[in-house]
UniProtKB/Swiss-Prot annotation:
Cofactor, how bound (note): Binds 3 Mg(2+) ions per subunit.
Family stated for the protein in its record: Belongs to the class-II aminoacyl-tRNA synthetase family.
Chief localization: cytoplasm
Record InterPro entries: Aa-tRNA-synt_II (IPR004364), aa-tRNA-synth_II (IPR006195), aa-tRNA-synth_II/BPL/LPL (IPR045864), Lys-tRNA-ligase_II (IPR002313), Lys-tRNA-ligase_II_bac/euk (IPR034762), Lys-tRNA-ligase_II_N (IPR044136), Lys-tRNA-synth_II_C (IPR018149), NA-bd_OB-fold (IPR012340)
Disulphide-bonded residues: none
Name of the protein in its database record: Lysine--tRNA ligase
Organism placement in taxonomy: Bacteria, Pseudomonadati, Pseudomonadota, Gammaproteobacteria, Enterobacterales
Organism listed in the record: Escherichia coli (strain K12)
Localization terms from the record: Cytoplasm
Length: 505
């Protein structure tokens, strides 16, 4: 047996012994009738205590004679004979406990406290004071075991380092990694901030079906499920768009939804099959109004959540304070591939030759618009680091967007990029029912030709448009990618609490 294997075997034995010991301790608690009590009530969290009392001197705390009750997980413990220091962790952070044998009821210190383990959940009451080093602490007069942890915590110095284990056992990741906890707190703040921003602008939050008979609103491969009661195959939604626009037809002129979408596609640092989107629809507006809204939303969130409009992402500083750059798709191609002859982008054969010269495999079903879009994605997208709006998307790749009045080959659409990634997609909505019907037919033809991401024909949606959709603009923003930017995270799994994972065999 190699030394490495021997160490691994020893670790397994040590773990098994610890599990056995902890279960024996729980059995003893059960015999005493004190396992898992539920009558302890705290009155402060650690962050509340630090916010209110960190600025006070010990003399002030002694004069105030403040008694508090806290609860949380025991992360560290230093036993020094008749007294000990404990680090207690709760939702707000950490607070130090000073535990002295003679200040607790008889037997608690030696017979209970010293037998508890790291990871156990405790309740503590006592008076606030500051140590000689100035650390805010609680001098405990009551200490109780609220939950016995049967498994040990990850190594206290290194936390949970294995990346896959962090995703599979997110609870351990949250216990041991401050950075992960902060990421998901920021995510929650972003969601709350978006909702407040939207309500302030007169939008109503709604919910639309997660299971749909016809998946629409995006070009993607759907997940299929079966509804037993209806004996009907259904699809997990790839987007809520068509239902939200039905609501605008119905008279709800400003609606938004924050919820999950599902796309049966690959997993990468940018993609998770289940992801969160915010979609909004605004009557009597066009895509330019949504460019303004998007810019204002990101600037507001950065200022409110981070306290500044400059956001560090990797080795760059993203500036949400200055006006965002705006380029047409063709301008972006020219900027990042200067040798491009713009006239070649108007000719199918010339554009195809450019695409193939940069390694793009051109499918038979692609038209000129799709080829130009693929060229843009290949040569320009990764360079769009600072917030940038790309406009004038071809109609071929924008089946739900309104055609431009001057050039019907393009649409009144934009995509929003930060850090070389698409963050949002918005456009003036197509409200011509006959044009929409024809574009659905074009999508059906593309699907028949082998494009499994092409859209289905949605007859009911066309019928809704025939009743009249006001001039409307719509926008979708990827929440997960937004959170990645605001938390300096470089893989989408770091900002999703429970990302899709292959089961452990």
């Amino acid at each position: 047996m190699s030394e490495q294997h021997a160490q691994g075997a020893d670790a397994v034995v040590d773990l098994n012994n610890e599990l056995k010991t902890r279960r024996e301790k729980l059995a003893n608690l059960r015999e005493q009738g004190i396992a898992f009590p539920n009558d302890f009530r705290r009155d402060h969290t650690s962050d509340q205590l630090h916010a209110e009392f960190d600025g006070k001197e010990n003399e002030e705390l002694e004069a105030l004679n403040i008694e508090v009750a806290v609860a949380g997980r025991m992360m560290t413990r230093r036993i020094m004979g008749k007294a000990s220091f404990v680090t207690l962790q709760d939702v707000g952070g950490r607070i130090q406990l000073y535990v002295a044998r003679d200040d607790l009821p008889e037997g608690v210190y030696n017979e209970q406290f010293k037998k508890w383990d790291l990871g156990d959940i405790l309740g503590a009451k006592g008076k606030l004071f500051k140590t000689k080093t100035g650390e805010l602490s609680i001098h405990c007069t009551e200490l109780r075991l609220l939950t016995k942890a049967l498994r040990p915590l990850p190594d206290k110095f290194h936390g949970l380092q294995d990346q896959e284990a962090r995703y599979r056992q997110r609870y351990l990741d949250l216990i041991s990694n401050d950075e992960s906890r902060n990421t998901f707190k920021v995510r929650s703040q972003i969601l709350s901030g978006i909702r407040q921003f939207m309500v302030n602008r007169g939008f109503m939050e709604v919910e639309t079906p997660m299971m749909q008979v016809i998946p629409g609103g995006a070009a993607a491969r759907p997940f299929i499920t079966h509804h037993n009661a209806l004996d009907l195959d259904m699809y997990l939604r790839i987007a809520p768009e068509l239902y939200l626009k039905r609501l605008v037809v119905g008279g709800f002129e400003r609606v938004f939804e924050i919820n999950r979408n599902f796309r049966n596609e690959g997993i990468s640092v940018r993609h998770n099959p289940e992801f969160t989107m915010m979609e909004l629809y605004m009557a009597y507006a066009d895509y330019k109004d949504l460019i303004e809204l998007t810019e204002s939303l990101f600037r507001t969130l950065a200022q409110d959540i981070l306290g500044k409009t400059e956001v560090t992402y990797g080795d760059v500083t993203l500036d949400f304070g200055k006006p965002f750059e705006k380029l047409t798709m063709r301008e972006a191609i020219k900027k990042y591939r200067p040798e491009t002859d713009m006239a070649d982008l108007d000719n199918f054969d010339s554009a195809k030759a450019i695409a193939e010269s940069i390694g793009i495999h051109v499918e038979k079903s692609w038209g000129l618009g799709r080829i130009v879009t693929e060229i843009f994605e290949e040569v320009a997208e990764a360079h769009l680091i600072q917030p940038t709006f790309i406009t004038e998307y071809p109609a071929e790749v924008s089946p739900l967007a309104r055609r431009n009045d001057v050039n019907p080959e393009i649409t009144d659409r934009f995509e929003f990029f930060i850090g070389g990634r698409e963050i949002g997609n918005g456009f003036s909505e197509l409200n011509d029912a006959e044009d929409q019907a024809q574009r659905f037919l074009d999508q059906v033809a593309a699907k028949d030709a082998g494009d499994d991401e092409a859209m289905f024909y949605d007859e009911d949606y066309v019928t809704a448009l025939e009743h009249g959709l006001p001039p409307t603009a719509g926008l979708g923003i990827g929440i997960d990618r937004m959170v990645m930017l605001f938390t300096n995270s470089h893989t989408i799994r770091d900002v999703i609490l429970f990302p899709a994972m292959r089961p452990v065999k």
